[in-house]
Amino acid sequence: AVPDVAFNAYG
């Protein structure tokens, strides 16, 4: 998965 810091460390 791509890093999605807006939700959590991994999205």
UniProtKB/Swiss-Prot annotation:
It comes from Ruditapes philippinarum. Significantly inhibits the growth of Gram-negative and Gram-positive bacteria and fungi in vitro. Has antibacterial activity against S.aureus (MIC=9.6 mg/L), B.subtilis (MIC=76.8 mg/L), M.tetragenus (MIC=38.4 mg/L), E.coli (MIC=76.8 mg/L), V.parahaemolyticus (MIC=19.2 mg/L), and V.anguillarum (MIC=2.1 mg/L). One of its GO terms (cellular component) is extracellular region. It is found in: Secreted. Belongs to the big defensin family. This is Big defensin. The keyword Flavoprotein does not apply. The lineage of its organism: Eukaryota, Metazoa, Spiralia, Lophotrochozoa, Mollusca. Coiled coil: none annotated. Keywords: Antibiotic, Antimicrobial, Defensin, Fungicide, Secreted. Its main location: secreted. GO terms for biological process: defense response to fungus; defense response to Gram-negative bacterium; defense response to Gram-positive bacterium; killing of cells of another organism. Signal peptide: none annotated.
